């Protein structure tokens, strides 16, 4: 070990002066040195070799002049050193030898300069240091041992002294400050230890710098981590002392320089390396005894690790992570939850203890944290949070919101919450305690978990979401308790969430628009907001929207302009008028207001476009929240009708599409037929069955086309764009159709999704469906819309079509127009382009015709594959030729086509609401079908790729639809590639329109004979890839169009299906084809209903691809206006058959089984344009036999915007399929028409009358699903569940067939319904069919009504229960209010009663006061009550002179006539008072009366006789000023008043005794005392007049009593009116004044002789 810590030269460690770490000892109060950070860096740069293993010391040395001190280091007396020198000493930093820094042995150490040692010794011995060191002697044994070694090293290195001002000195200082790494910690790989040096240096600098702070704390803290030996050796107080001195000594070396080095001394023992080594080892053994073994291992100078370095290292090693601290803190407060799995922390106060668990959620509460405190806690107790959530659905909201839309809105709210300041500080318990969080946190919610729940649609209301967000705050306040920033952030997140939830509840549509559009405020919600002029205090009236009224006094408004929201009093709101209600505004406000009004005008324009009209309200019309609906209707006429149209599009519009999820998970969009229009319209909402059947038809056609197309359709959803759906009244998934509007109780996308298996015929009301679908479309959050848009754009790019501007059909319609034009051009330009354009056209046609379309989603990969396969000349030659033909035809008929297209587009716009096609990648690949189709079509590779053809749904058909006129008449013998398109049943108008369109197209597009090589038997079905062609890819979505009505559904699958050609149905004589064409021509070209019927061409496995041109020519296109009869090349099934099929709205898919002729042309059943008058025209036209070679492209209905029609794959051989399908088609058509065509019936009836239709449907189904080809008459399949023919275990296809078998049931049910409806409503109506149809409708209605009644019952019961609860609550409230009111009234009455005096006898209000708590209403009551009251009367005073009762003495009441000024009036004593004399109070204004004759004239005062009361009790009665007493004296009493007393001006009371019986006379009259006892020292108030009374009762006047009653004999003397003493206080005052008035000298209280008089309240004593 190095001896860097060796003691000074003497080696006497006991006498060495202890030095604290990092500093020399000094008493000089120099300023604290500034340790610059540069010293840290400088050290590393300049002296990388210096190791911190040696402590560097500052050595105090005197300037060179004072270096002569050589006293022994052992001497500590201050005499050896000059005090002044100690003050001038400089502190030099001693550095270890650089070269030997890492060596633990002192062999290479140089000797310390003697002069330096002497200087150090002299400084140590200074008196100042001695005084300083006295308290720290215990540290000597350890702290002075490092200096000699350092001195030696420093001397050898030539760096004994170095100024701290130099950079090198700063480095050394930092080295000294730096703590050495503990020997127990292995050294880092770097030998220089620069890394940890720098850290320790920085730590040392921070710990050493503060001067004002108590260093004892820091050092004591470090000391606490020392080992036991260190703590024993070094007491804490010495450490504190050393720390105090540090800041002073550090600055001593500021002025020291290298020039001041003294000569070396060689007589130091420390120079002996052996001694230094032993000494150091000894000290280290004592200090670091427990680490000796570790020190032995370190040979790089780390052996002598300092105590403080050890302390710091220990601290760092034992530092706890925040997670551990949180775990320990939670463990301290944790208590078991009330129930396992519940929250152990109170939801309110976040404390543990005795908690009450909620029965609905995991929250727990203290009983005292729940309000009200009287809550009953039992097993069914629900916490306040759960109560709020349960009440959420009952709260009135402006608009309902679907779960999907709510999820989308909540995602916006979550994004806003994530941007709250400090939200990143909210840690999830999962992050902190990934393994043990469940113990403390039962619901660790984070933003990620919220996002996942939102995606999963877990929240049914905003209250649920807010309740979940509160868990974030709850967990954060528990996990980071005491962290103010976390608390603020959590509160801010909850606040933002609450605000967003309120906004969502206020108006979901506005909230969605606000987060998705910059122009959201001018858009019109489905339920428009009322426009107001609203005024906030301090602001002018401002235009605003009324978002809703929270109560009857405040309105929630949003102002135009900055879109601020506020609650405005109702009284400050006026309906929006054209005239500004502001009287005047400032210039700035006027400018801003003008801008806002412009925005309002834009909004009003939107309202007019959506609602149709807007009326300004009259000037200053008050807004009434209770009349909001009426006011809204007044301002926006027809607004509620528009809302109803949106909510129930099926009932309002002629065309409806039923979107149904079929058994194969395919979403089918089906037109509802007009059949049973009356019934179905009523049924529309209740009976989606027909539509479902149509949907099934779609799927069937799809099956004909390809299984893959079905799969694609499975995942498709039709969703209206959220933005437009909100604003567009027509954006409904259900396309409105007159006849089937009711039928369309189309299952909305929701329904389809919800009912995947399914075959519910009546899913939901059309209105509900539309709503749900609308919401779904919205809700399929923007992401789906974006996906659709992207997909559509990609698809459009792929197909060469313009990308649809929006997923909505309206936009798609525009796109379709463009696409159609493009398609037409493409078709004209190139056959290769034509397939794509044809597909577009087919979509357009479908849209125009408003026929049922199945939207099939094809995964993008599959789409690409399909396109590739299409590129491969798999497509039947028919498809390409039609394209070629189409160009020709287009050239010829472009003008017609353009006109027709325009008309069709207009129709589409009118009919089809915006539909957003939601694309979802189908799990099932279309590749199989594509592959199958491709092999089948491969022989036809010469032809356009199947997909292209199919995309064109025989592009030819689509192209013709796009440009029906251009094509020349389809060549009768040219085989048409038939794309199986299932048509929905069309209403008559629609059918006529479709027929006309088809006929036009047929005329315009001459069917080009495409010799189709006999397609491989069912493999062509695999043309399902071709379906890709027939199925138009919009984005990733493909739409298969199914027109059930068109029996001859043109299966352009020929294009898809490897050139499935229209093959005349075998059973149907082809000769009728001419008839068919005439019929077609006959059909009115313009059909009343815009729906064009698309001919269903059954595409059989395409035969060897015929020349594309031929196929194109064969494609028959019926223009809506063009009735050009398309005569199938050779044999067309009887037109009647086809028409009948169309009329029945059944989708008849003739199956071409490998007939060569059929192979050349897939059977196309052209549907003649329907006449508005009748469907017979349909019967006339039979598309089935239109030349078998005619490509099925014949009149493909335009797909819904962006929808592509998958061609129906032909089963087995085209011939067989044609034959089979032909017969069924004929039979079915005849059955539908109600007339059996001879040919068809003969062919189709053969075995089972049902077989033909069923066989056709089954064949289509099988083709659609891609199952093996059907037998001509699959009786087994029809008569069994199919398990024998296609056992589910046979393979995946068979399994799928089995699983989807119920689709056939649905399909046939719908077909039968349509058949019945057609038969009942046709020209030759069948009564039984009508009865059956009506019965069916009746059953549906009954079920629907039952359901409605049940709903009403349930709703009414709920309402009644709620009303009952409300009434009970109201009853309780009213009772409580009444009780409170009664209690208040009672208290008030009691108070009033207390304020009044009540008669002690009769309890009436008392006017006369007797004594305390005794008053009377009148004298009789006093007399009656006196016997009981006399004993306790406060007036009773023992008589001064008893008067015997035998002495009769008449009462003489001296009359007083004194002015109110208290002038005494002489009252003559009345000798003979008359009994009738009245007692009167003298009026104050009366002049004084002359003295009576009886009175001694010499006296100024009237003679008054004082009657001293005997011992009998007396009653004191307080008389009001207005009270007069009648005299009751029976005998005349004469008694001169002997001694009048000073008058009591305030006396208003009289003492009354019960009236004696007439026989009793007054007792002897005793003269009153002139000096009655003065009970109070007060003098009477002379200003108060004395009231005199004529008392009718014998009155005993007590001289001591304060009251006097004077009886005036017969004549009334004017009396001074005194104030009536009505109040007890007046009485008490009078009483005291009367007592005080007794004055022996009769002294006058006033200088005025009249004012001064003796007490006139002479007491008259009466005896009973």
From Swiss-Prot:
Zn(2+) 1 binds at residues 346, 349, 366, 369. GO terms for cellular component: chromosome; cytoplasm; nucleus. The keyword Secreted does not apply. A zinc finger (MYND-type) spans 1399-1433. Keywords: Bromodomain, Chromatin regulator, Chromosome, Metal-binding, Neurogenesis, Nucleus, Transcription, Transcription regulation, Zinc, Zinc-finger. Residues 775-784 have a biased composition (Basic residues). GO terms for biological process: nervous system development. Residues 296-308, 676-690, 935-952, 1037-1053, 1620-1648 have a biased composition (Polar residues). Zn(2+) 4 binds at residues 1410-1411, 1429, 1433. Residues 1-16, 30-40, 61-84, 309-320, 953-962, 1073-1097 have a biased composition (Low complexity). Residues 874-884, 1006-1019 have a biased composition (Pro residues). Residues 528-579 form the PWWP domain. GO terms for molecular function: histone H3K14ac reader activity; methylated histone binding; transcription corepressor activity; zinc ion binding. The keyword Ion transport does not apply. Coiled coil: none annotated. Zn(2+) 2 binds at residues 358, 361, 383, 386. Chromatin reader that recognizes specific histone signatures to regulate transcription. Plays a role in neuronal development. This is MYND-type zinc finger-containing chromatin reader Zmynd8. It comes from Drosophila melanogaster (Fruit fly). The gene is Zmynd8.
């Amino acid at each position: 070990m190095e001896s860097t810590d060796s003691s000074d030269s003497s080696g006497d460690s006991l006498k060495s002066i202890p030095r604290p770490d990092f500093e020399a000892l000094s008493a000089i109060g120099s300023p604290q040195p500034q340790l610059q950070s540069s010293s840290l860096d400088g050290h590393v740069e300049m002296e990388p070799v210096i190791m911190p293993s040696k402590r560097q010391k500052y050595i105090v040395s005197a300037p060179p002049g004072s270096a002569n001190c050589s006293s022994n280091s052992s001497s500590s007396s201050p005499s050896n050193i000059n005090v002044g020198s100690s003050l001038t000493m400089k502190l030099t930093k001693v550095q270890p030898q650089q070269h030997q820094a890492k060596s633990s042995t002192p062999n290479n150490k140089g000797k310390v300069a003697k002069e330096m040692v002497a200087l150090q010794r002299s400084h140590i011995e200074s008196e100042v240091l001695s005084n300083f060191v006295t308290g720290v002697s215990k540290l000597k044994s350890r702290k002075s041992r490092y200096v000699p070694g350092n001195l030696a090293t420093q001397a050898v290195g030539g760096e004994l002294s170095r100024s701290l001002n130099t950079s090198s000195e700063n480095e050394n200082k930092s080295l000294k400050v730096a703590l050495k790494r503990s020997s127990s910690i292995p050294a880092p790989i770097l030998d220089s230890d620069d890394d940890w040096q720098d850290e320790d240096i920085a730590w040392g600098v921070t710990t050493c710098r503060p001067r004002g702070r108590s260093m004892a704390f820091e050092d004591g803290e470090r000391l606490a981590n020392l080992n036991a030996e260190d703590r024993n050796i070094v007491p804490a107080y010495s450490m504190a002392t050393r720390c105090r001195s540090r800041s002073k000594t550090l600055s001593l070396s500021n002025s020291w320089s290298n020039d001041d080095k003294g000569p070396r001394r060689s007589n130091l023992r420390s120079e002996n390396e052996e001694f230094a080594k032993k000494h150091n080892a000894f000290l280290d053994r004592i200090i670091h005894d427990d680490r000796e073994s570790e020190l032995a291992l370190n040979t790089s100078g780390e052996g002598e690790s300092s105590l403080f370095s050890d302390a710091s290292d220990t601290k760092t090693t034992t530092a706890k992570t925040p997670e551990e601290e949180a775990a320990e803190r939670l463990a301290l407060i944790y208590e078991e939850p009330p129930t396992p799995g519940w929250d152990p922390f109170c939801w309110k106060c976040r404390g543990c203890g005795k908690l009450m668990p909620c029965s609905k959620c995991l929250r727990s509460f203290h009983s005292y944290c729940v309000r009200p405190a009287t809550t009953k806690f039992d097993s069914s107790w629900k916490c306040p949070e759960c109560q709020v959530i349960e009440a959420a659905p009952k709260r009135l909201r402006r608009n309902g919101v679907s779960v999907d839309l709510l999820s989308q809105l909540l995602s916006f709210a979550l994004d806003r919450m994530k941007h709250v300041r400090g939200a990143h500080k909210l840690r999830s318990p999962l992050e902190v305690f990934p393994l043990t969080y469940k113990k403390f946190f039962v619901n660790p919610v984070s933003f990620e978990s919220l996002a996942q729940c939102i995606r999963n649609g877990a929240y049914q209301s905003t209250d649920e979401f807010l309740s979940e967000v509160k868990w974030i705050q709850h967990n954060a306040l528990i996990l980071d308790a005491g962290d103010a920033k976390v608390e603020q952030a959590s509160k801010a997140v909850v606040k933002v969430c609450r605000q967003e939830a309120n906004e969502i509840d206020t108006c979901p549509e506005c909230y969605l628009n606000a987060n998705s559009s910059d122009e959201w405020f001018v858009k019109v919600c489905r339920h428009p907001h009322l426009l107001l002029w609203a005024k906030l205090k301090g602001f002018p009236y401002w235009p605003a929207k009324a978002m809703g009224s929270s109560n009857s006094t405040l309105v929630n408004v949003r102002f135009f302009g900055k879109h601020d929201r506020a609650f405005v009093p109702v009284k400050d709101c006026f309906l929006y008028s054209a005239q500004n209600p502001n009287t005047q505004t400032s210039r700035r406000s006027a400018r801003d207001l003008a801008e806002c009004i412009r925005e309002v005008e834009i909004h009003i324009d939107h309202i007019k476009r959506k609602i149709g009209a807007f009326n300004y309200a009259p000037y200053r019309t008050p807004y009434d929240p209770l009349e909001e609906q009426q006011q809204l209707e007044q301002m926006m006429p027809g607004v509620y009708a528009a809302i109803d149209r949106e909510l129930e599009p099926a009932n309002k519009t002629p065309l409806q599409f039923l979107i149904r999820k079929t058994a194969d998970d395919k979403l089918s969009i089906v037109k509802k037929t007009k059949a049973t229009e009356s019934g179905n319209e009523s049924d529309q909402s209740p009976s989606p069955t027909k539509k479902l059947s149509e949907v099934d038809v779609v799927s069937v056609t799809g099956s004909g086309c390809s299984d893959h197309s079905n799969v694609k359709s499975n995942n498709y959803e039709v969703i209206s764009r959220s933005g437009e759906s909100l604003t567009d009244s027509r954006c409904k998934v259900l396309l409105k159709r007159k006849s089937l509007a009711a039928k369309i109780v189309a299952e909305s996308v929701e329904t389809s999704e919800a009912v995947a298996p399914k075959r519910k015929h009546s899913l939901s009301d059309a209105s509900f469906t539309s709503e749900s679908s609308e919401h779904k479309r919205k809700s399929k959050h923007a992401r789906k819309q974006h996906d659709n848009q992207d997909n559509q754009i990609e698809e459009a790019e792929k197909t060469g079509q313009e990308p649809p501007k929006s997923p909505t059909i309206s936009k798609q319609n525009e796109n379709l127009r463009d696409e159609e034009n493009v398609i037409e051009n493409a078709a004209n330009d190139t056959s290769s382009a034509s397939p794509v354009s044809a597909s577009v056209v087919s979509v357009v046609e479908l849209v125009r015709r408003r026929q049922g379309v199945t939207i099939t989603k094809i995964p993008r990969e599959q789409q690409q594959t399909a396109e590739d396969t299409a590129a491969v000349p798999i497509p039947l030659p028919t498809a390409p030729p039609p394209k070629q033909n189409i160009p020709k035809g287009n050239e010829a008929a472009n003008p017609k086509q353009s006109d027709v297209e325009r008309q069709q587009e207009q129709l589409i716009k009118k009919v089809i609401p915006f539909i957003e096609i939601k694309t979802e990648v189908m799990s099932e690949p279309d590749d199989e079908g594509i592959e199958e189709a491709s092999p089948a079509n491969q022989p036809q590779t010469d032809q356009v790729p199947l997909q292209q053809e199919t995309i064109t749904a025989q592009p030819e058909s689509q192209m013709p639809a796009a440009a029906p006129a251009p094509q020349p008449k389809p060549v009768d013998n040219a085989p048409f590639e038939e794309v199986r398109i299932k048509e929905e049943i069309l209403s008559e108008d629609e059918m006529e329109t479709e027929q006309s369109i088809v006929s036009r197209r047929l005329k315009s597009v001459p069917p080009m004979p495409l010799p189709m090589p006999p397609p491989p038997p069912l493999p062509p079905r695999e043309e399902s890839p071709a379906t890709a062609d027939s199925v138009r890819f919009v984005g990733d979505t493909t739409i298969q169009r199914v027109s059930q009505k068109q029996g001859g559904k043109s299966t352009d699958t020929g294009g898809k299906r490897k050139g499935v050609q229209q093959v005349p149905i075998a059973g149907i004589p082809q000769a009728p084809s001419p008839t068919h064409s005439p019929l077609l021509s006959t059909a009115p070209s313009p059909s009343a209903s815009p729906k064009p019927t698309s001919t269903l061409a059954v595409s059989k496995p395409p035969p060897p691809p015929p020349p594309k041109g031929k196929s194109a020519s064969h494609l028959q296109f019926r223009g809506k206006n063009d009735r050009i009869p398309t005569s199938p090349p050779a044999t067309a099934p009887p037109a009647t058959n086809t028409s009948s099929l169309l009329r029945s709205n059944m989708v008849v898919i003739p199956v071409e089984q490998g007939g060569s002729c059929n192979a050349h042309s897939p059977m196309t059943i052209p549907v003649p344009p329907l006449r508005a008058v009748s469907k017979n025209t349909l019967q006339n036209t039979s598309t089935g036999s239109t030349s078998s070679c005619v490509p099925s492209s014949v009149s493909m209905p335009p797909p819904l915007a962006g929808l592509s029609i998958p061609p129906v794959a032909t089963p087995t051989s085209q011939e067989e399929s044609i034959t089979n399908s032909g017969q069924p088609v004929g039979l079915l058509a005849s059955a539908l028409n109600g007339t059996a065509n001879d040919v068809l019936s003969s062919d189709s009836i053969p075995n089972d009358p049902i077989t033909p239709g069923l066989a056709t449907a089954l064949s289509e189904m099988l083709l659609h699903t891609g199952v093996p080809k059907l037998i001509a008459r699959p009786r087994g399949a029809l008569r069994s569940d199919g398990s024998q023919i296609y056992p589910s275990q046979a393979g995946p296809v068979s399994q799928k067939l089995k699983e989807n078998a119920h689709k056939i049931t649905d399909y046939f049910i719908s077909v039968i319904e349509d058949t019945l409806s057609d038969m009942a409503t046709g020209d030759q109506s069948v009564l039984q069919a009508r009865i059956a149809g009506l019965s069916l409708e009746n059953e549906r209605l009954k079920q629907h009504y039952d359901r409605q009644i049940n709903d009403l019952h349930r709703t009414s019961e709920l309402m009644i229960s709620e009303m009952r609860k409300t009434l009970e609550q109201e009853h309780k409230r009213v009772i409580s209010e009444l009780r409170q009111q009664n209690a208040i009234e009672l208290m008030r009455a009691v108070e009033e009663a207390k304020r009044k005096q009540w008669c002690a006898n009769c309890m009436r209000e008392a006017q006369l006061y007797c004594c305390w708590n005794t008053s009377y209403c009148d004298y009789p009551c006093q007399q009656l009550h006196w016997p009981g009251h006399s004993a306790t009367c406060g007036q009773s005073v023992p008589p001064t002179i008893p008067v015997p009762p035998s002495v009769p003495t008449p009462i003489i009441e001296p009359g007083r006539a004194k002015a109110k000024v208290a002038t005494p009036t002489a009252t003559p004593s009345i000798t003979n008072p008359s009994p009738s004399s009245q007692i009167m109070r003298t009026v104050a204004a009366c002049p004084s009366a002359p003295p009576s004759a009886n009175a001694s004239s010499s006296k100024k005062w009237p003679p008054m006789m004082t009657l001293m009361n005997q011992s009998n009790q007396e009653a004191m009665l307080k008389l009001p000023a207005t009270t007069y007493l009648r005299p009751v004296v029976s005998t005349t009493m004469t008694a001169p008043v002997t001694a009048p007393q000073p008058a009591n001006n305030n006396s208003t009371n009289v003492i009354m005794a019960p009236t004696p019986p007439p026989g009793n006379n007054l007792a002897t009259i005793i003269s009153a005392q002139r000096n009655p006892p003065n009970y109070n020292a007060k003098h009477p108030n002379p200003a108060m007049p004395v009231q005199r009374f004529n008392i009718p009762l014998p009155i005993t006047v007590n001289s001591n009593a304060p009251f006097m009653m004077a009886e005036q004999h017969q004549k009334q003397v004017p009396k001074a009116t005194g104030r009536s003493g009505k109040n007890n206080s007046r009485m008490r005052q009078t009483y005291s004044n009367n007592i005080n008035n007794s004055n022996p000298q009769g002294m006058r209280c006033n200088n005025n002789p009249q004012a001064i008089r003796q007490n006139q309240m002479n007491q008259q004593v009466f005896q009973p």
